[in-house]
Amino acid sequence: MKYTSLFAAACFAAISLQTDQSFAQDADEPVSQCLAIAQTMPKVIFASLDANPLDLKGDVTITYAGHSTYRIESPQGVVAATDFSGIYGTEPTMPRIVTMNRAHSSHHTLSPDPAIEYVLAGWNDMSTGPIDHDLVVDDVYVRNVATDIRSFGDGMIADGNSIFIFETAGLCIGHLGHLHHALTDDHFAQIGRLDILMVPVDGGLTLSHQAMADLTRRLRSSIVLPMHLRGNSISSFISRMGPDWDSIFLKGNTITVSVNSLPKQPTIMVPRSLGRSGGFSDF
């Protein structure tokens, strides 16, 4: 297991940082396919001996596991699980990569399974400033954009959450995490293009449905996958997206998608188990 951050605060036990440099490469660094303007990317941690691991072909399988956890499986079989707490996302196989956020215990774990190779925390306990992830594992590139979270008292905790972006098979897949504020132009520039967006739709613990809908419309992703549902709030979020967005309730919890199969009209796709928890059973 390789850790890229420490949990060390009053509420969090420390986990030691381990970085296996045996896989580090000085070869060409990957360039994000999601950024509109090419920039020099920061140094990345390679987890593959392939000097040019990013492939633009193949299908990506995305499965809703529960709460805020989606499993993303690349064409080469690399599995990443989002906002991983250890409760969801471990079946049928343990993911190689997990991302976590610190807002609540349902979004992280202090004791990830040792079989997980890469544990990416969305916050930085080692120093001031945002955590910065740039990780390549075979055909998957993972990076993050830091945002703030509300503290348990007044005010905000700077850089306490991360939007994680997964690039594989030419697709740009973003997970907003436990987002607590509107995004700035700088955030949008760092995020770039997102073909698939995983968005919290609780309507209160993160952002209001209106604020989340406004943000989602600006990102203009081809597929929107809801998560972090409370009560019947999915219908409230969908209604605020407006007529330019289609919505479908999936027959299962899994979609398979490629660059060529993205819908022409932006579409909200509600996984079966999420829809059922939101009071929709006739599908």
Model-derived segments and spans:
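Active-site-proximal loop/helix segments of hydrolase catalytic cores
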Residues: 148-219, 230-236, 240
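A Lys-centered signature of the CheY-like receiver
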Residues: 227
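Residue-level detector of transmembrane insertion/anchoring sites
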Residues: 8-10, 168
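Bacterial N-terminal signal peptides that target proteins for export
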Residues: 1-8
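Cleavable N-terminal signal peptides
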Residues: 10-12, 22
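Metallo-beta-lactamase
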Residues: 5, 18-148, 173-176, 195, ...
